[in-house]
A protein has these predicted regions:
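Catalytic-site neighborhood detector that most strongly recognizes the C-terminal catalytic loop/helix
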Residues: 216-218, 309-346
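Long, amphipathic, Lys/Arg-enriched alpha-helical "connector/arm" segment
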Residues: 103, 108, 149-176, 198, ...
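N-terminal core-binding DNA-recognition domain of tyrosine recombinases/integrases
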Residues: 37-156, 188
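Short, charged phosphate-coordinating catalytic segments
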Residues: 134-136, 184-207, 303-304
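Conserved tyrosine-mediated DNA breakage-rejoining catalytic core shared by Y-recombinases
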Residues: 197-235
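Active-site/catalytic core of tyrosine-dependent DNA strand-transfer enzymes
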Residues: 227-279
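Basic, Lys/Arg- and aromatic-enriched nucleic-acid-binding interface segment
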Residues: 163-192, 288
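Short, polar N-cap/turn motifs at the start of nucleic acid-interacting alpha helices
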Residues: 204-205, 280-281, 300-321
C-alpha cells in the first residue's frame, strides 16, 4: 500500500460525493459546471487525452489540481469577462485575461500578484485541447484559442542552505528530525511522497543503500547509495525498535514543516537565502534542492546524478540547483584536454617512427658486432697456429 500523505484520493472522493448530491459545482453557471464535470470524468478514465501525454487515468493529485484551478478560472471569467460558458471564449479574451493576470492587473484576494500564472495557463490549454477533441468527434470544428498563450513563468523560489548551514541546522535538531534532515540531504528523495513510503526493508542490511520502489516513485524506481546518513539511520532504527515492514518515518508533513520553519528562523533569521526564499519558509522539499547542490560537483557523470534524483531530463539539474555552491575546479592537469586528438596521433606516430629507427640501428649494430666477433675468432685461430709452429 502506498501512503498518500496529503489524502488526495480521500479529498477527491469526498468532493465527488458532494457534487453528486448537489448536482452542480457550487457558485458556477450550469454550463461551466457541466463542461468541467464532463472533463474531469474523462480525465478520471483517461479518455480524450492528448496523444503526447501518458495513457491511462489521471492521478488523484492531478484531478484535484484540475478541479481547483478550472473552477477558479470559471468564476474569474464570469467576474471579469462576464461569460457563463468557457467554451464560447475568444482568443482575444483569454489572451487579455492571462496577460492581466501575469502583470498584476488581476490580483489575488490579498492584493498581491499571482506568481503561478503559467500553472493556470497550462490547465486551461489542456482543457481547451480536450474540448477541441470532443467537438471533433461530434463533427464540429473548434478553433485553438490557446496558441498565443504564454505558459512560461518564473521559477519558484526556495531556501538554499550551504554545507556549513546544513551542519548547524542538523546539530540543532532533535534526534528524530536530525535523522530525517540528514536522510533528505543525503538521498535527495522527494518529500513527503517518496520519503513517507520508505520501509526498513528498503534499506540494505548495512544501511548503506536505499531502494526507492517503483510504485512509490513519481518517475522510476532506483537503488542509491547512502554516503552520509547510514550510521545515523542504523542507530535510529535500533533505538526505535523498527521491524523490516515498518515505515521508516511516521509523521504529519505539516507538523514537520512547521518545526523546520521555526528552527530555521531561530538559527538564520528571517532574511532571504541565496535561492530567493526566506529562511523561515524552509520545508522538507528544500533539502532536495540543497542535496542537488551538494552532489552536483561530486558526481562524475550527469546520467548518474539524474538517476540518484529520479530525473529523466537534464534540465532538472539546473532547475533544482541553479548552480549554487558550484566552484571552479579546473587544474593544470586538466589542460591535457586542450591537446587535440590529431596532436596526440602525431605524437604517437613520431614515437613509433623513433622506435622503428632505434630498432634498425640496434639490428645494424648486432650485425656489425657478429662480423667483428667472426674476425676476432679467425684471428685467434691464426695466432694459435703461429704459436704451435714456432714450437
Amino acid at each position: 500500500m502506498k501512503i498518500d500523505p496529503y489524502n488526495h484520493q480521500e479529498r477527491w472522493i469526498r468532493w465527488k460525493d458532494k457534487i453528486q448530491k448537489l448536482g452542480v459545482i457550487p457558485d458556477l453557471s450550469r454550463q461551466n459546471s457541466e463542461i468541467i464535470l464532463r472533463y474531469l470524468s474523462d480525465m478520471e478514465l483517461g479518455i480524450n487525452t492528448s496523444m503526447k501525454s501518458k495513457k491511462g487515468a489521471r492521478s488523484f493529485v492531478r484531478l484535484n489540481t484540475i478541479k481547483t484551478r478550472l473552477t477558479f478560472l470559471s468564476r474569474k471569467f464570469k467576474a471579469i469577462l462576464d461569460t457563463d460558458d468557457m467554451t464560447l471564449l475568444t482568443e482575444e479574451q483569454v489572451c487579455s485575461f492571462f496577460v492581466d493576470m501575469r502583470n498584476g492587473v488581476i490580483k489575488r484576494l490579498d492584493g498581491r500578484r499571482y506568481k503561478a500564472t503559467r500553472d493556470f495557463v497550462k490547465i486551461f490549454k489542456a482543457f481547451w485541447h480536450w474540448w477541441q477533441k470532443v467537438a471533433r468527434k461530434a463533427g464540429q470544428t473548434v478553433e485553438d484559442i490557446t496558441v498565443y498563450l504564454d505558459s512560461s513563468g518564473e521559477k519558484p523560489e526556495w531556501v538554499y542552505l550551504n554545507e556549513k548551514q546544513i551542519r548547524i541546522f542538523w546539530e540543532s535538531c532533535n534526534l528524530k528530525y536530525r535523522t530525517i534532515v540528514m536522510f533528505l540531504f543525503d538521498t535527495g528523495i522527494r518529500a513527503p511522497t517518496e520519503l513517507m513510503n520508505v520501509k526498513v526493508s528498503d534499506l540494505s542490511s548495512d544501511f548503506k543503500e536505499l531502494n526507492i520502489r517503483e510504485e512509490t516513485s513519481k518517475t522510476f524506481g532506483r537503488r542509491i547509495k547512502l554516503m552520509i546518513c547510514s550510521e545515523l539511520l542504523k542507530r535510529y532504527v535500533e533505538n526505535n525498535g523498527l521491524e523490516r515492514e515498518d515505515y521508516l518515518f511516521k509523521f504529519c508533513p505539516s507538523v514537520a514543516n512547521r518545526y523546520l520553519k521555526r528552527l530555521a528562523k531561530k538559527l538564520f533569521g528571517d532574511g532571504k537565502s541565496l535561492a530567493g526564499q526566506n529562511y523561515s519558509d524552509l520545508t522538507m522539499y528544500d533539502f532536495r534542492h540543497c542535496s542537488c547542490c551538494y552532489w552536483l560537483p561530486r558526481y562524475k557523470s550527469e546520467s548518474a546524478l539524474k538517476f540518484r534524483f529520479g530525473w529523466k531530463k537534464s534540465d532538472k539539474i539546473h532547475y533544482y540547483s541553479e548552480m549554487l555552491g558550484m566552484r571552479d575546479t579546473i587544474s593544470e592537469e586538466d589542460l591535457l584536454i586542450d591537446v587535440t586528438k590529431t596532436e596526440l596521433e602525431n605524437r604517437l606516430s613520431k614515437s613509433e617512427n623513433k622506435s622503428e629507427l632505434l630498432e634498425a640501428q640496434v639490428e645494424t649494430m648486432n650485425s656489425q658486432m657478429a662480423e667483428i666477433l667472426s674476425h676476432v675468432s679467425k684471428l685467434s685461430e691464426k695466432i694459435v697456429i703461429l704459436k704451435n709452429g714456432s714450437c
